Amino acid sequence: MKVYCLLLVLLVGLVSQAHGQLDKKCQMVCTFDYRPVCGSDGRTYPNKCTLTSTACMSQRSITVFHDGEC
């Protein structure tokens, strides 16, 4: 039982560290300028920076499908 608890603690630590590295990699300062873009996922984003940040944090490939709302 102690071994399982130790493994669980180590696993949680590794996942937390990986998530922290992702946060640092995806850290962006986006402005509040409203220049909507339609993402390849069918969602409207306030601007390209927000789309790029969302794609990075979700680890998905989201590109600008076209300018303007979807």
From Swiss-Prot:
Family according to the record: Belongs to the conopeptide P-like superfamily.
Primary role: Acts as a neurotoxin by inhibiting an ion channel. May also act as a serine protease inhibitor, since it possess the kazal serine protease inhibitor signature.
Keywords: Disulfide bond, Ion channel impairing toxin, Neurotoxin, Protease inhibitor, Secreted, Serine protease inhibitor, Signal, Toxin
A GO BP entry: cell differentiation
Species name: Gemmula speciosa
Protein name, UniProt field: Turripeptide Gsp9.3
Intrachain S-S bonds: C26-C56, C30-C49, C38-C70
Gene Ontology MF terms: ion channel regulator activity; serine-type endopeptidase inhibitor activity; toxin activity
